[in-house]
């Protein structure tokens, strides 16, 4: 269509890994607020490099700053762009999945509190393998489908969302090993990061 630029199977190195993308940029409906559609696959990228290089990640996924390891991701995204070519977060919608063979997260207040309550310092540093998290972005929030982690002998099932307002709203189902406090604990709520 007139006013639309399309790209197909564009490949590049990005974020310490590789990326391939197809999509379009269009001013056909509104020259002041161009429409961006993007389907991307990212492989072997660095959490910290992505955080350092993308403002949208710093705003929507501040947890990346405290995350080590590499990830792969599939993303299907649509948004309007502002006059400065930034995403218009009110129109941003996406579906995707992020996968990591080895992820490390530390210095998260909620996990520090959980470690103190359960007297298990292993919970202060999350190290998980074979993580697969499906997510959607709507209304300024990234919502994740329930996913499982095993940390310090404790099984966690997490689901919830993080927002542009720097809040995190997650529910955690914690299964403790036999011999500790034992049993299952469910906790949740909204906190500022």
Enumerate the language-model features and the residues they cover.
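Small-residue helix/turn framework positions
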Residues: 2-193
